[in-house]
Amino acid sequence: MTNSYIKDTMDTFSEFEVEQDDLDYWFNVINEEVFEGTCPSPHLMLVKRQRGSWGYVKQAEFGGEHWVALFMSPKFPTLAAFIQILAHEMIHVWQFLSVGDTGNHNKNFYSWRDRFKEFGLDLRRNY
């Protein structure tokens, strides 16, 4: 098992309100620990209220340029839930920007399952 700040934080059980600085901070921590620095930063990362979703990644073409945006809800039941879902969404960012994948829950997506387990993260389709 890997020692990590992520793993140590997964026992936090109080409600977590996300600020933009939190999103930036945890993206960097997860990128360094889980992705070993291989997840490119999306073009846009925002804390944004969204109905029926804790987080999502959107890709679009603007002026012939490929853009990827990551959106996360401003409230989570726990910090652990936020970390779990952000890490999940980061796989989609990685799929779009690193391997040119569709970003679906496919073989590339689930190739991260063992790595997630090392950090106490559960990789699944829905949360």
Q: In which residue ranges do the predicted regions lie?
A:
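Walker B catalytic acidic pair
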Residues: E89
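Active-site-proximal or metal-binding-adjacent scaffold patches in catalytic folds
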Residues: M1-Q84, V93-Y127
